[in-house]
Structures are given as structure tokens and as C-alpha cells.
């Protein structure tokens, strides 16, 4: 009897372990995960403010994505590269006009910067929002006019 319980328990543990392989268990359908966050690539063209509102409406606690470490950056690069190759993508970083510093929309600290060479340049003095650039395989940032339309990345 003891051996049967031990083997049954082992099979149960194995089944639960395998059920999580390749699945985003804690994310809704259409979203992918990295660590404890969920992400969704949105194929609509929106201004930065429109994209932020869309993310908030799409999912409770949704925001344009913050990117807080290199591992997260690499995961996002891999996901974007599967889908798009020549499209820049809004993320949740913008220049605070009040404080003149870059801030994540979700309030998390800017712990790293991944600017493309020569960026941010505030071209024509109206680039206050940030995209992941396709030419960098979505690893680097560029400041852009917030009123331009781009596809975007939501996170919760």
C-alpha cells in the first residue's frame, strides 16, 4: 500500500510539472508571460495616450509596458521578433514635463536605460514618449513624438 501511494504521488507531481511546460498558466488567452507579469502585443496603430488607455481598458492593472531588467528586455525582443520585423512599438516610458526626467507610466523605477546611439534627442523639441526600435531587434529605445501612431505592448 505504501509503495502504491508513493508511486501515485510521484505520478501526480510529474503530471502537474508537465502541465506547465510551454503554457502561460497565469496569463489570459493571447497574453504571454515573463516572471510574474503578462504581456500582449497589440496590432493597432495608436498614439501613446490612446495606447495607454487601450491597455488600461484591456486588462485590470494594464499599462503600456515597463522594462525593468535585461532578462525582460531579451524576452520581449524574442516575442516581438517572431511577430514583427520593421515596426517600432510604444512602451510605457515618457519624459515627465514637470520633472524633466524619464518615468515609467506604472510608477516603477527606471533602473536601466537602453537608448539607441544618439538618443534621446528630442527631435524638433517634441519627442516625449518612447518606442522599442525594430532596427535593434526591439532591444533599444528611441524617443518619439507622442502623437505619432505605433503598435504597442501592454503589461499587467
Swiss-Prot record:
A Pfam family assignment: Lectin_C
SUPFAM superfamilies with a match to the protein in the record: C-type lectin-like
Keyword Signal: yes
Record bears the keyword Nucleotide-binding: no
InterPro entries assigned to the protein according to its UniProt record, in alphabetical order: C-type_lectin-like, C-type_lectin-like/link_sf, C-type_lectin/snaclec_domain, C-type_lectin_CS, CTDL_fold
Gene Ontology MF: a single term: carbohydrate binding
Chain location of the short sequence motif Mannose-binding per the record: 119-121
Taxonomic superkingdom: Eukaryota
Subcellular locations according to the entry: Secreted
Glycosylation sites (chain numbering): 35, 109
S-S pairs: 27-38, 55-154, 129-146
Signal peptide start-end: 1-23
Transmembrane segments: none
Keywords on record: Calcium, Disulfide bond, Glycoprotein, Lectin, Metal-binding, Secreted, Signal
Residue ranges of every copy of the C-type lectin domain listed in the record: 34-155
Cellular compartments per GO CC: extracellular region
Expression tissues: Expressed by the venom gland.
Residues annotated for Ca(2+) binding in this entry: 127, 142-143
Function: Mannose-binding lectin which recognizes specific carbohydrate structures and agglutinates a variety of animal cells by binding to cell-surface glycoproteins and glycolipids. May be a calcium-dependent lectin.
Similarity section: Belongs to the true venom lectin family.
Protein name stated in the entry: C-type lectin lectoxin-Phi2
